[in-house]
């Protein structure tokens, strides 16, 4: 049986990307709300979103709210499944530590 670390997804190896996916859940969230919730800069959040978008894990929608441009981000089904696998691998790795 392979070690559970092989189930970790490289797309989630930065704390911000992992936090971003967890924050999204099944909702579409405004960029500004994500920035505030994750306590990060526009630049760092934009980079994290771009990386996850390239992996197919998030979808980005741009539009306007009134006359103001807005960006919304949502986890894709592929992204939610990848996060579930990643978290399961982390839990399995942690179980080994907690059981000792």
How would you label these PLM feature ranges?
Residues 1-5, 22, 81-100:
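Amphipathic alpha-helical dimerization/coiled-coil segments
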Residues 49-53:
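Short, hydrophobic-biased segments on the C-terminal half of alpha helices
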